[in-house]
Amino acid sequence: MSTIVFGSFTCHLDAAIHQDNADRLAKAWTRPENRQVSNAHLLCRRAAESLINTYESATASAWKGLEEKLQPMFAKREFSKTVTKRKGLRCFKESSEKFIEKKLRKQYQEERERLQFLNGPDAIVNQISVDKCEASVRVPSPHIIEKPSFVTPSMKKKVVFKKVRMSEASLQLFMRRVAANAKANGQKVEIIGRKRVVGNYTTKSRLTYFRTHVRHLDGSKPRYDLVLDEATKKILQLFANTSGFHHVHKKGEVTPGMSGFVVNPMNLSDPMQVYDTDLFIVRGKHNSILVDSRCKVSKKQSNEIIHYSDPGKQFSDGFTNSFMQCKLRETDHQCTSDLDVKECGYVAALVCQAIIPCGKITCLQCAQKYSYMSQQEIRDRFSTVIEQHEKTVMDNYPQFSHVLAFLKRYRELMRVENQNYEAFKDITHMIGERKEAPFSHLNKINELIIKGGMMSAQDYIEASDHLRELARYQKNRTENIRSGSIKAFRNKISSKAHVNMQLMCDNQLDTNGNFVWGQREYHAKRFFRNYFDVIDVSEGYRRHIVRENPRGIRKLAIGNLVMSTNLAALRKQLLGEECIHFEVSKECTSKRGENFVYQCCCVTHEDGTPLESEIISPTKNHLVVGNSGDSKYVDLPTAKGGAMFIAKAGYCYINIFLAMLININEDEAKSFTKTVRDTLVPKLGTWPSMMDLATACHFLAVLYPETRNAELPRILVDHEAKIFHVVDSFGSLSTGMHVLKANTINQLISFASDTLDSNMKTYLVGGLEVDKCDEFKNVKLLIRSIYKPQIMEQVLKEEPYLLLMSVLSPGVLMALFNSGSLEKATQYWITRSHSLAAITSMLSALAAKVSLASTLNAQMSVIDEHAAVLYDSVFVGTQPYASYMMAVKTLERMKARTESDHTLNDLGFSVLRQATPHLVEKKLSPGIGASLERVKLVGKILCNLGIAAMAKTYTKTFHPKRRRRFRRQVRHLRSVITWQPVQTPERRSPMEKRRCGLLYIPVDGEAILQSHRNLTKFSS
């Protein structure tokens, strides 16, 4: 039996003789010499044929079902192609429908041609021609839908290079010219034969040599240093035809550094190992014998040969290349060659030996030994060496100060070590076994500190984290320790009143002993204009009694200004309205560490009970200062007008800034009030916290130190609503509140400290939310002031940076320039502020440049190009003007917009902004035109009034004939002045003739005509 395996199928067959063997056996039996043998071979042959037929029928029946089942796959595989996958697996890949259609079309064409050929009549072919007519015989073919082909013809043109053919002489001439060009320009030459040979021309001892690149120059020591075939050798011989090749070298002239030099062996005096008599390529010397690079040497000899390479040049080349790659690209100066190159080499060697000491810079053992050394070993062995090198540089090369500084710092870093092992041991002994916090943090810090100079950056970060945990633990522990009960807290008012030197100076008091504000009175209007309301006495005081706050209400005693002559009724006014009573608690105190900060606490009596506020009587037009001590009454800066001012709801803390103004010098009052209005109040907003208010006071105290001892107005503490009330001159009808002890600005600033433990830091104080600056409104104000000298003068003095808003419109800028406002601003500020004078001068120059542009877009381009220059000139710090930050933001926006537009234009994008300046100019130009028309109208009216007055005065004394002549002269004069023709009496209508007293008729409209008639009418 025999077994055949097909995949997972196993077939068992009877042993049979193959057909070929049976035939061979039958032939052998039919030979003559075997005819007498028995007929046994016939039986064998028949048996073999029977077995073979049985086997073939069994095989066919076994595969028949499988072939029928796999017939669709075989049909599809007919058009598939074989591909090899990633790991060598070969498989079939299905073809696309387009490919199958192409194959079927090709088969159909071939079959049709074959049938046409077979079905055609027999004929003798005399000539062969192509019949374009379609044959009558059609072969059935599958229906194929032809799709249109969208193929773009390739525009690529095939370039056919002309073959270069040169004669031997031309080739020799060509190579000589290549050699001459390489020698003149110092270029490399590559000779490509069986192997590539690279060479270049070099000069040594005033002789020119051709030098090939040999393998030992790369650091290896091969047996063959260079391999040349015969063709390459001939070309190399032609390139080596130099002065050095023909030079007769004496003994010892071939020295190190000449590796790869091509010389004539016939001109060498030294003993040498010759490869041939045509060339000698220097490799080195072995046992006083020069060795050719082409000679084969043993491995032992290759290590013993003294190679004539130039390690110094290799080091120099590597150093130069690396230095050029790593050098600073951005420097603030132009680098020059000031230091001697040779001395630079000396110092570089000293630095190299100081950082990495070694016997040879190429020694691998020295490098490995240094890399295996610990930092302590390096410190012990080389710190003295570094100090010696530092002294050498100091004595011999003092001009290398930067190297000296580096060595000094490097030596100091190496010596950083912690030798206090006793402290480390004691800490470990005391708390080393304790793993809970904070002892775990202490142990970790102890382990890190003992490292000393070996601490890494990560160690420093870890030590800081553990130290922070210790600080947090200590802070929490300190807060949790109670040093005593709050019942023992006492904070009495000082028996001594605070002395305010500003209110005692005779130079600042008038004859009645009242404080004189001086220039401070004018600048204080910024507070009253924005943060105070004028009390209308005719409406009574009742509407001002209740003051609302975000957390409750407080009643003022302003109603007590109306007093009764009845003593009993008058005594009732001394009674206030009680608030909720609060005992002394933690909310009343402030601590820093374990100690109370008494000026930031509420006032108490001797027995520890809180000092509660009583009714505070009102006054008229006074500023009351002196919080916990005796109050001092100062007349308000606006008392002369007789009006009464009351703070708007929510901004009573402005009284604190008004009290600080008393201590401000008169020449600084303007800056102080503008700083408060423009910088601090917008940041504080409505109802700021006491911490924010104290921070603002600290900001002012830094700028104006004389305000530190300024007295505070009375401040009441409402613990129920958690609000501070700054009491003004109208007092307080609400009673029972606590009183803050802080009496000066310096004491109030303590609330700004983060280390102060106080709940009162978060209490609210009065404030105000001011409107943000509107650019469009300010530009309209600037336009309105162009032809109004009084408004322009106020703008120039109080808000000079408002002039910079003219850059938003070329028309506004030109109007400012033409009206003379910029010149006037320059003359005003030239003696007061050089920076503002420079800005106005720049605006004048910019207006002159804008006037040269013919279109609006060109004018805006001129302004945009100068926005960056204006921004750099304007933005020089903080200025006490409300318009300053608005001008800075405007210029900054224009600068950024210009830079981005330039980038877009460079990239080829269009900017839509070119259409917007026309809209802005259209919006602003009517304002300028209207102002100018009003000025012209006023001028016409004044001119008419003058002419009418003159005519009325002089015509009374004239004769009637002279009077008519005078009227004609006046008409002519008026037409010359106003540039408007006047109708003669002959041209007038009958109605106008009856009104012969009318001098001229303007043409500005019927309303203006009527007004002019009323102004210019007079009788003849």
From Swiss-Prot:
Residues spanned by motif Involved in virions binding and aphid transmission: 618-620
Domain of life: Viruses
Site label Cleavage, positions: Y308, S309, G766, G767
GO biological process, one term: transport of virus in host, cell to cell
Keywords in alphabetical order: Host cell junction, Host-virus interaction, Hydrolase, Inhibition of host innate immune response by virus, Protease, Serine protease, Suppressor of RNA silencing, Transport, Viral immunoevasion, Viral movement protein
Entry keyword annotation includes Ion transport: no
Family: Belongs to the potyviridae P3N-PIPO polyprotein family.
Entry remark concerning the domains of this protein: The N-terminus of helper component proteinase is involved in interaction with stylets. The central part is involved in interaction with virions and the C-terminus is involved in cell-to cell movement of the virus.
Protein name: P3N-PIPO polyprotein
Source species of the chain: Plum pox potyvirus (isolate NAT)
